[in-house]
Each structure stands twice: as C-alpha cells, then as structure tokens.
C-alpha cells in the first residue's frame, strides 16, 4: 500500500488503538502502535509530511465507530485508515453478561453489518484501508471467548476479501510469537490489551504493509 509524503494516516479502533491518546487525536498519539508507527515514519522519512491521527476510543464496539464515523474519520479526509475493532463486540458477552451499566455484546450478524457499513463509508470517502482482526492472546483452543473471537475475525477476513482491502491477522501474529517462545504474559497482561512488546509486534507488521514513497 503506497503512502506518499503528504498523506494522512488515521488509526481507528478501541482501547488497543487508544492507549491514552490526546483527545484531539493529533498531539499525543498514546503509548501504543499508532505512536510507534508515527515515530518510525518520522525518523525514517524525515523529509515527509505524513500526518498521523489516532482516533481509537477505549470501550468502543462497531456500534460506536458508526456513530462517530463522520466527525472522527470522514471529516478528516484520511488517505489511509487502519481499523482494529471487534474485541469489545465479543468481550461484553463474557465479562459483563448480566450488567446494565455498559453496552451489551454485539451479535455476529450485527457486527458484520456494522463493519461493512464502516468499510463502505470510508472507502467511498476515498481512503484505503487495512483491517486488523480481533484476537485473544491465549493459545488454548478450548477457551470459549477465543473461539468466538476467531469467528468474528473470520467476518473481518471475509469483508477484507470482498472489498479488496489489506488485512493484518493478529491472532496468527501473536500465536507465532508464542510458538517461538514469547510468553503470552510478555505480550499482554490480560490477554487483550497488548504490552509494549505486543504493540511493537503490531507496529512492525503494519510498517511492512506501508510502501512509503
């Protein structure tokens, strides 16, 4: 995916993307992979004027992304959008199934519909996209939430293929690192939110997909 010297790169998602960013999305990009990528681009291509914007928001599901898409994404007219969403769509079925104090989980058919609408609106606005699949940093195939998460990841993969989008599969990325001896606890303390090492892995894989010219 080509990124030219005056492009705008926007990171969209939930807490995995947010990582304590400045509310504006531009000044401080948080402690995660968006900041790492912005730093790598700035150091490797100092002559470029690539604007990086972080619009990750903690707790977001696809429902929330849809509700803020115009203001946070389309109005910024990005050239490239990375989207990491779906974890909270699944997680709320497992961590808070009975509470009424937060959004409930998003059924998979609604997830598909929401995600497809997000993709359509962003691409029709002229941006290229990279989808990051939902994941759970747990190698136990019998873990129920992991099983569900992978079903949502399949939806993400299907839509990436349908709309000819770039795809970064995070479950295989983390499982590959664990297979090589990296502990799951090195990658995440709670199996969802990446550690510095986990974010580094994401940032490096995304940088491989960017052809900065």
Regions picked out by a protein language model, each given a short descriptive name:
Residues 29-37:
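Short N-terminal amphipathic alpha-helix/helix-capping patch enriched in small hydrophobics
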């Amino acid at each position: 995916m080509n990124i030219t010297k005056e492009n705008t790169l926007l990171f969209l998602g939930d807490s995995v993307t947010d990582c304590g960013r400045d509310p504006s999305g531009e000044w401080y990009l948080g402690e995660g992979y968006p900041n790492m990528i912005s730093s790598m681009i700035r150091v490797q291509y100092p002559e470029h004027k690539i604007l990086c914007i972080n619009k990750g928001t903690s707790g977001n599901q696809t429902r929330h992304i849809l509700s803020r898409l115009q203001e946070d994404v389309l109005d910024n007219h990005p050239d490239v959008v990375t989207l990491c969403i779906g974890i909270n769509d699944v997680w709320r079925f497992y961590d808070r199934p009975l509470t009424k104090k937060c959004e409930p989980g998003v059924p998979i058919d609604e997830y598909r519909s929401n995600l497809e609408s997000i993709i359509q609106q962003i691409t029709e606005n002229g941006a290229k996209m990279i989808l990051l699949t939902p994941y759970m940093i747990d190698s136990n195939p019998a873990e129920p939430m992991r099983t569900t998460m992978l079903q949502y990841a399949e939806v993400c993969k299907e839509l990436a293929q349908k709309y000819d989008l770039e795809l970064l599969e995070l479950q295989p990325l983390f499982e590959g690192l664990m297979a090589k001896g990296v502990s799951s606890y090195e990658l995440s303390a709670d199996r969802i939110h990446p550690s510095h090492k986990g974010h580094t892995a994401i940032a490096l894989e995304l940088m491989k997909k960017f052809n900065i010219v």
